């Protein structure tokens, strides 16, 4: 099975607090993987490293590859990092859309990386690009909102627009950082259904950070659980049982309670 993402010896320190400890991870083509863990476990930090939004510690000897290209090595971004990012759709918890633009215009932003610079200056997109954007919106059930300003949409609708933008980008990997954290249950279900659909039908590799264990078990065949910056569990979601859940979350809660008592 083809390895799409390779992480070796990744360590990260913030203000003398080590957020990640020598993390090793391989993710294969077509997988939908959930990164689980309590707050502060390092799951979002790990995800941001995968696209080079942040860099690891320079002394750790770390190396991250995505689609066969080096993203970063020993805390330094690769010179051709833009080529890696061009194939990676990143979905943020807070949507990261341009509120003053329409839904269609936000999706077209996904084509900027493959559009000549002079066209981007004037927002001149081709008819073919606009058709692809409408097709992406159709995939996520948002085509009827194409000409509506994105600021008028609900949180779940905005997240689906962000997914459509990744489709417009023709991303081969989607990294989704807490995409349902602020959504109601119905909106969360629709967003996760959408991610699973493009994973299964388009073969796009999806890595998603989640707090909600039930969604991870329902939608992802593989779970990578982090605990205090270490990989605590990496395996089938079917084998992530109550005992592992208890050790991952409740032991952390006991540590926090003891710290407060002290």
From Swiss-Prot:
Catalytic activity: phosphonate(out) + ATP + H2O = phosphonate(in) + ADP + phosphate + H(+)
Catalytic class of the enzyme: translocase
Domain ABC transporter: start-end pairs: 5-253
Keyword Isomerase: no
One MF term in the entry's GO annotations: ATP binding
Protein name: Phosphonates import ATP-binding protein PhnC
E.C. number(s) listed in UniProt: 7.3.2.2
Keyword Repressor among record annotations: no
Described function: Part of the ABC transporter complex PhnCDE involved in phosphonates import. Responsible for energy coupling to the transport system.
Membrane-topology descriptor: Peripheral membrane protein
Cross-referenced InterPro entries: AAA+_ATPase, ABC_transporter-like_ATP-bd, ABC_transporter-like_CS, ABC_transpr_PhnC, MetN_ABC_transporter-like, P-loop_NTPase
